[in-house]
């Protein structure tokens, strides 16, 4: 997957999260979880764009670690919302959870590759 494709995928993920949460009920519990989810899901793309502008491999790795953490946090809040949802949003929340988990896997693999490259370049 190219950098531009991943930027587009992150953007699509954030937009789908935002559109889905508009369908959820509003109460204290949902509102608290939704606020956290909006922050983490939109941070995935924003922080990936920042990582793409990194000054060095080490800087890229540090920024990409934040991206991975935000994607994982999004998975957590999507899982909670899917579990407590009593409406017809379980399927969509499950689909978003799957996408979030795939993004986590992509970033974990990318981090592993970059760390190996950094090790090789030091030797």
Model-derived regions, located:
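Short, C-terminally biased terminal segments at protein or domain edges
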Residues: 1-43, 47-50, 54-123
